[in-house]
Amino acid sequence: MELGPLRVLTVLLCLAPVFAGLFISMDQPTLSIQKSVLTITTNDTLNITCSGQRAVYWSWPNNQSSVEKRLAVTGCSEGPFCKTLTLLRVIGNDTGDYRCLYGDSQAATTIYVYVQDYRSPFVTSVGDQLGIVYITKNKTVVVPCLGTVSNLNVSLHAKYPEKVFVPDGKSISWDNKKGFTIPSHLINYAGMVFCEAKIDNESYQSVIYIVAVVGYRIYDLTMNPHYQVELAVGEKLVLNCTVRTELNVGIDFRWDYPSIKERRATIRDLKTTAGEIKTFVSTLTIESVNLSDKGRYTCAASSGRMNMKNSSYFIIHESPFIHLEKMENVVEMKLGDTVSIPVKFKGYPPPEAKWYKNGKVINANHTVKLGYALVITEATEKDAGNYTVVLTNPTNKMQKRHTFTLLVNVPPQIGENALMAPVDSYKYGSTQALTCTIYAVPPPAAVLWYWQLEEECTFSPQKVRLGANPYACRKWKVISERKGGNQVEIKQRVVTIAGKTKTVSTLVIQAANVSALYRCMATNRAGSSERVISFHVTRGLEINLQPRSQLTEKDNTSLQCTADKFTFEKLSWYKLSTHVSQTPFGGLPMPVCKNLDALQKLNATVSNVNGENVTLELILRNISLQDGGDYVCIAQDKKAKTQHCLVKHLTVQEPLHPRLVGNLENQTTNIGETIEVLCTVNGVPPPNITWFKNSETLFEDSGIVLKDGNKTLTIRRVRKEDGGLYTCLACNILGCKKAEAFFSVQGAEEKTNLELIILVGTAVIAMFFWLLLVIILRTVKRANGGDMKTGYLSIIMDPDEVPIDEHCERLPYDASKWEFPRDRLKLGKPLGRGAFGQVIEADAFGIDKTATCRTVAVKMLKEGATHSEHRALMSELKILIHIGHHLNVVNLLGACTKPGGPLMVIVEYCKFGNLSAYLRSKRSEFIPYKMKSARFRQGKENYTGDISTDLKQRLDSITSSQSSTSSGFVEERSLSDVEEEDAGSEDLCKNPLTMEDLICYSFQVARGMEFLASRKCIHRDLAARNILLSDNNVVKICDFGLARDIYKDPDYVRKGDARLPLKWMAPETIFDRVYTIQSDVWSFGVLLWEIFSLGASPYPGVKIDEEFCRRLKEGTRMRAPDYTTPEMYQTMLDCWHGDPKQRPTFSELVEHLGNLLQANVRQDGKDYVVLPLSVSLNMEEDSGLSLPTSPASCKEEEEVCDPKFHYDNTAGISQYRQGSKRKSRPVSVKTFEDIPLVTTVKVVQEENQTDSGMVLASEELKTLEEQDKQVKIPFSTLAPSKSNESVMSEASNQTSGYQSGYHSDDMDNMVCSSEDTELLCAQEASPTLPRCAWPGIYSPAPVASLPL
């Protein structure tokens, strides 16, 4: 078979490496000296030639011999690949291997050369002063002491301790070329070793070698943190791998982790030594973890001969979180047991756990341990309650909470068992009651009574000594159907004794006919208890103890044995020498007196022989403990001559000093709450307890209750003056003991009390029936309440127009302070509706911390409300909380925000509606001054000064109502609170409207706006329609839900075709969309115009268009209203200053209006008020009242007046601002022209505008026109003439009493005649005390549309 050329080439290529290896091995360099060992002497010359097939090189020993200066490598003539090594003057340290090799080091020829030097027989390494020998356990170690002379006699010396080792031919040997070989365990103790050789009896030493023991054992490898570790994205990961080894061990660390390829981690190693342990720490760090870093981190350590590894697992969360798992809502345990209630949750980072009991923080003690589990050992009844655990994330302060109820079940305890059971007999035929008082938690479902005939039970005196039940009754029968041996009846009731609820079961025996044993048994889930009562019936024989049953030493008492003198004779008293009949389960009298020898006869006297009975009285004086025991009365039956005995046990107690059980604790409480303090005292005789407050004796009074023998002190409706030092003093015959505690009362004072509530309630109820009678007689339909009650809707805003997100996110809501239960809210009739919500009148039970209910207004969303609308109402709630509490602001009372029902905002209810409607309704009753009788005029001189003083006090009272952030359901402080002497003032509807009222309304609105400004809030829609009238002439500002923080968004702009109240808006607001506090001052000036025009619409007859806005900016202003004074009109002009900075502040307005109010009252006292001429004429002609407007008229009345009071010398508010840089207002200003007085002409606004200046849709305008056609406006003759536009505005005003105009969409207005107004006021003056009962469950009333 022939092979092709290709196949031959392939075979040759495969065999090439084999031939190359053989060629290399055969082609080793050759030396000129053909020996493996060459011996020469010192100072000789070493000359060796090396030849090869390629270039050759020489290597020689690297000893301390300065060989480079004496050695030369040169070429030779034998060939191109030949080199000669020449070493001159050789020395002993030149001993070693000399090698000739090719450049690839694959082939070499070696010759070992001894340079014999007997004066230095050991080779010294280069630079070695001290050598190091590394020793490993259980290994053979070589000490490299090489010899320059062959066949030396060498030994190894070790220090310390000193020891010499010589070669034994086995484990210990010496080799010239290698050194001294010895097992490591023989020299591991040594600090140093060296070799020693003897030549001609002289010893030569090698260099000294330090012995270094090298270990390998790894004791452990730990990871910190270990197991499962949690981190959040962005946090730092630090993982320590710690290795503990024996000494002289080197460790090599290897890490494996998820992001090892990205090399995002840094690793640092550290080693320390402590004692016999060496510690290595390798730290892996990732500065900012991400989700890709999740996984297992493994650390491996190697010492060469030993390996070990460990790992930790890291979980990376995207953000911190807390997830609370489902837990039990009710936990039950038995009295004295131990319970552990764990909190099941997942969260990162580990949250902080805080525990609360009944709303108060609890701390750990010897019986309560806290953490992620609540552990209670040896539970007592005090441990029961509502527990709340609050988990707080320390990073983002996220909280999760869980509340559960801990019930401590108490086995039934029958109180009578703890007392000494009396050994009494019961008279035949008498009615008796046997009682079992049971305390148990939970209360026993039922208390069962059993009975057994006395003769059917056996009595064992031996069991008495053991404290066991001495009665053995086998046939206990349940008492039923009124049968229990005797005619019986079972009664059961629940009582509260010393703060504990107990069940009292009473077995009433109608007629004691049969002696029997009765047993009561109570059972609950924690256990059961029973009491056995001996019921022994006697005929004509009984024992009484006088004066009481509990006796102490040195008392006097008497035992009276009474018997039927026709049945018994020979009565005598004896005393038993031993007590045999008394048991803890009830005593059994001795039925027959058989053992009279055991009795000691006592001297007694017959005290009563009258009638059918005879009484033998045993008198015991100054008794001692020895007088206690069983006393027996023996009587002999006259007919049968048998003896009958009755036993009475007398217990004498040793007097004990009073002893307090526990101590009183200092308390801090809020005004209006209830304090209950228990002073538990033991002592014999029972101590008498007296309470003191600040060292003065405390007696029961209104709100102060003493019960349980004065042990319990209860202070209801705590007031400020109830604070102080309270002392409980307990005294008996041996002395006294006292306990003290200091009570602190905090919070604002509420001056209401029970007596005032009863008085006002009675008066209001009487008024209610009187008004009901008037309504029946007059039969006039009630005015539409929608005009008066819908203003509460104002804060429910269009979420598309107002950015409420910031409100919701930044303003807090504290549910613990503001949340009100829905089941305590009874919804009533609707008050009004808006585009997004509705307002319902409701009764709130207990919202003001009392047991009564209060009428409130509740804001709700309509059905199908969107999430944005829900957030808008929530935003309004938070704004109300942020604004706080003030007398002249519609205040928040509470809210219902919890899931399970609609969102509700509870605010104050103002029954008289908005100020605009009220002023219009009172036009026919307006008088500029108060009417005074002749009797008043006679005493005018004395009274005039009192008016100013009284008003000043009222102003101070009102202005002292400082703002505060309300902390819960606190009842509004009205004028009746700060002015108690005015509590019985007449109803607003019965009083005429006066100039003083108008100024007072203005003053109060200014005061409320001053408060809102102090809270950094801007109203932006201040108008009479947004001012509500409450009791006692108090006005309250509403519709500040759009108020904004002036430091957060001062340039807020409402976009789109929203309806804006242009007539009330300042020029800078109209043109620049800038809302500030000073723009609210402009609106306040317009509000003053409304007030002093008695509710007319501003800018009468003026078309609200671009021309109006231009003229307003140029300085044109409204004319003076019909009922104003020069001072008030000048104040309006000051508020309408074109430069916002020149307008007065609300604080300045408060001061100015307060002064005007005082001045007006002084003028009122003088029957002098300056009014426009038209008003004066109307008053004189129509009412028959004269106004003294001249000095002559003043003299007729013998009064003083100032005829200089007129427009020309009127000063504005600037006179009240000293140092003001603001210029005075001009005396005259340009005003808008009035329309002619044509009352029959119907004026309709063009371009879909209403009097408010709001842009209306055409559909709304048509509705307004239809309403206007239906409404007629009657006026009394007392009302002054007005423009046609003012008349029209009363019927077409776009706002209603409780609802701003641009929120209302389905309400109309009605202005009543004087007769209608009187009836309306009578109907509105409903009783102030709620006419409601406690609601069972929350059930929203249906909201019906109000009639148009």
Curated annotation (Swiss-Prot):
Activity control note: Present in an inactive conformation in the absence of bound ligand. Binding of VEGFA, VEGFC or VEGFD leads to dimerization and activation by autophosphorylation on tyrosine residues.
Reaction(s) catalysed by this chain's protein: L-tyrosyl-[protein] + ATP = O-phospho-L-tyrosyl-[protein] + ADP + H(+)
Active site as annotated: 1021
Tissue-level expression: In all endothelial tissues during onset of vascularization. In later development, present in lung, heart, intestine and skin.
Name used for this protein in its record: Vascular endothelial growth factor receptor 2
Mode of membrane association: Single-pass type I membrane protein
Induction section of the entry: In vitro, it is induced by basic fibroblast growth factor (bFGF), uniquely in the first 24 hours of cell culture.
Broadest EC class assigned to this enzyme: transferase
All ranges on the Cytoplasmic side of the membrane: 778-1348
Upper lineage: Eukaryota, Metazoa, Chordata, Craniata, Vertebrata
Post-translational modification: Autophosphorylated on tyrosine residues upon ligand binding. Autophosphorylation occurs in trans, i.e. one subunit of the dimeric receptor phosphorylates tyrosine residues on the other subunit.
Extracellular side: 21-756
Domain notes: The second and third Ig-like C2-type (immunoglobulin-like) domains are sufficient for VEGF binding.
Gene transcribed to yield this protein: KDR
Positions of glycan attachment: 43, 47, 63, 93, 138, 153, 201, 240, 290, 310, 365, 386, 513, 556, 603, 613, 622, 666, 688, 710
InterPro entries: Ig-like_dom (IPR007110), Ig-like_dom_sf (IPR036179), Ig-like_fold (IPR013783), Ig_I-set (IPR013098), Ig_sub (IPR003599), Ig_sub2 (IPR003598), Kinase-like_dom_sf (IPR011009), Prot_kinase_dom (IPR000719)
Function: Tyrosine-protein kinase that acts as a cell-surface receptor for VEGFA, VEGFC and/or VEGFD and plays an essential role in the regulation of angiogenesis and vascular development. Promotes proliferation, survival, migration and differentiation of endothelial cells. Promotes reorganization of the actin cytoskeleton. Binding of vascular growth factors leads to the activation of several signaling cascades. Activation of PLCG1 leads to the production of the cellular signaling molecules diacylglycerol and inositol 1,4,5-trisphosphate and the activation of protein kinase C.
UniProt-annotated location(s): Cell membrane; Cytoplasmic vesicle; Early endosome; Cell junction
Region (Disordered): 958-983, 1280-1302
SMART domains assigned: IG (SM00409), IGc2 (SM00408), TyrKc (SM00219)
Alphabetical keyword list: Angiogenesis, ATP-binding, Cell junction, Cell membrane, Cytoplasmic vesicle, Developmental protein, Differentiation, Disulfide bond, Endoplasmic reticulum, Endosome, Glycoprotein, Immunoglobulin domain, Kinase, Membrane, Nucleotide-binding, Phosphoprotein, Receptor, Repeat, Signal, Transferase, Transmembrane, Transmembrane helix, Tyrosine-protein kinase
GO MF, one example: growth factor binding
One of the record's GO cellular component terms: anchoring junction
Phosphotyrosine modification, residue list: 1047, 1052, 1168, 1207
SUPFAM superfamilies: Immunoglobulin, Protein kinase-like (PK-like)
